[in-house]
Amino acid sequence: MSNNQTLIAQCEEKARQWLSPAFDEETRSAVEAMINNDDKADLIESFYKDLEFGTGGLRGIMGAGSNRMNIYTVGMATQGFANYLKINFKDKEQISVVVCHDCRNNSRLFAETVANIFSANGIKVYLFDDLRPTPECSFAIRHLKAQAGVNITASHNPREYNGYKAYWDDGAQVLAPHDKGIIDEVNKVKVDDVKFEGNKALIQIIGEDVDKVYLEQVKTISIDPQVIKNQHDLKIVYTPLHGAGRVMIPRALASWGFDNVHCVKEQMVKDGNFPTVDRPNPEIAEALTLGLRDAKALDADILMASDPDADRVGMACKNSDGEWVLINGNQTCLIFLWYIITNRQAVGKMKPTDFIVKTIVTTEVIRKIAEKQHVEMRDCYTGFKWIAREIALSEGKQQYIGGGEESYGFLAEDFVRDKDAVSACALLAEICAYAKDHGKTLYDILMDIYMEYGYSHEFTINVERPGKSGADEIQQMMKNFRSNPPKELGGSVIDVYKDFQSLEITKADGSKEKMDMPDTSNVLQWFCTDGTKVSVRPSGTEPKIKFYLEIKDTMNSASDFPACEQRAAVKIEAIKKSLGL
């Protein structure tokens, strides 16, 4: 029997378990069709493994099968989570959780399934009445003093996906030791163990009551309300890309005093099929096509777009030639943290112990700003749970004033412990108002930062490798980079190697030192003598390996920018060649 035939036989055996009466008729017929189909590709992809409850929860394609998002995989995850909560909070009279969801197909169904299972286990559930932004889920956990939370979302993944994010009592995604503890409990659960029959008496619907308190808190992060009064009619175009931002972001902007906000009509419609975009990802130009159409027609000052669960924000503005350009995640993070630092200092809100946080793959220019302004900057792993961890570690001792990552996630407050597109959109609008009040544009602010702290060009290469064979290939690539690391990148000599799996820093002369990080992570970083930085990591949520490139240069005036961009583009191609990409 060949390896492929063995795999098919194993998948068929597993699939037949899904034909039992424990599963509904629709699921059974979908599984039967896979078994009977001569092409076994669907069968293999749906059953070759169990959808893994990872450190962030679940993420996968919706459909029948053990490797798919459905009420059964969601149900087993929730039962395991409930079991862990009952062990961990055994002395608490009434455990409570918050359940939230985005606009995706089946999101409400999955959220109600989660609520039913928690309540059937004697756990009180605060269930949002409709879709809400991810940051509001985090806020609600803290505000309602719940022990945990679940958010049904797949962020900006394609429409076929859905996901399940697990939160702890501080409103952050679960970290050690609870992540491993929950995973262990989830892995013990079989479908027959799941208590699907809900207890309505333990489910409380929440909505506007939490919305109001959240919006009031978001208002408190404004640094310079006067510039908003001066520029209240700033022309803002906003799109939620059919997602949860539609509920809160226009309200947040209005509450800050912006009274000239235009929402992209076609994309204000809640729709998990995302009919107006190929991918609902504010990082990509195609998703902003309609937003740019409206921004040009209205001669707007800024365009902002949030992803389906409204935790990330993409932005566009006019350059010095009056052309609309996308501002990438690193650039937005630069503008965001530069404004927070310099303007908190200007209005006397800064304390010597205040700190900011960025992720290891985010631009090093932020380090330069922090050093020059004498502000503590911390580096952490990719993923906002690590930024939340830094906030928690310093609670009551030092004040977190802002953080962000290159993947379009930003947080300016500590009453939320996940990235927040609601507060970020409001603060970015304030920054735009500040620029206009000083006779500048957002683009001018970016150029000013490059001139003062150094030009930087960041470029991410995503190498997609779907399915089981893809996962194996990605593993092999990382193995090869470790055993045979490059010596140069596009002509730039590497002088520092960081391996976050072994937590070792290796210098070009062979000397080694240990890194102080809270955990290991499958990430490699190479630093060159000319400031070039390359980071390599497999994605935690998608079947791809990511290469983060950062190229440095000097910019004496805004007119130097095109030449810097050209040199960076040449350098990127040379680095790709060095890496065999």
Locate the predicted segments by residue.
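Conserved phosphate/anionic-ligand binding catalytic regions in large, soluble enzymes, centered on
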Residues: 47-67, 154-157, 236, 240-252, ...
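Short Gly/Thr/Asp-enriched flexible loops that form oxyanion-binding sites at enzyme active sites
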Residues: 110-118, 161-168, 311-331, 366
